[in-house]
Amino acid sequence: MKTIYLIGFIGVGIRNKQYQSEPGLIKVGHVGINFENDNRILGFHPTPEAINAIGGAREAMNWLRNRKDGNRLDGALQDDTAIFERAYELSLRGARCTVWQQAIEFDSDTFERIREQAYNWYEEQKLFPYAFPLSIEDIEWDNCATFPRRLGLTLPEASGQLQRYIPHLQAHGQAWKPKGAEE
């Protein structure tokens, strides 16, 4: 058996003045996937090009927060290892962003198929519609928490709401530490 990890944290908050200089994903929270024996954590979120096209990070956040209109941006899998490492560092300093992981085991063939698909999409920067959780049923979207379903992973919680999702990682997993972090 081989293991795929769902890794995630609840953000420090978009209005918390102490963290205003932090990247947006630290503020809102994030979920990524990691494959056994791989150092990278892949996360799904808007591409830099999509963010720049709408006028920058603040404008992108405002656009996505308008959920009633079904606003979406182009998103892709990206190497977000540094984001999870930063959340871990902040949690050690008292920020409410403990990083959690849940291990999911697969037979070798299924693991390799999922891993190959994820890395193909990552390398080609395949675009998918990214949105904050929408209740509009006829609009296709994913966010970081729901994207793993595209790879055939069963989600611990399907709403895409990190306030609901992360407690499932916590209940069925363990706290995450970067490779090389002190025990």
Go through each PLM region and give its residues.
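Short, well-ordered, aromatic-rich surface patches in folded extracellular/luminal domains
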Residues: 149-150, 158, 162-164, 168-169, ...
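Non-catalytic ligand/cofactor/substrate-binding and regulatory segments of enzyme domains
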Residues: 1-139, 173-183
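Active-site nucleophilic cysteine motif
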Residues: 27-30, 129-163
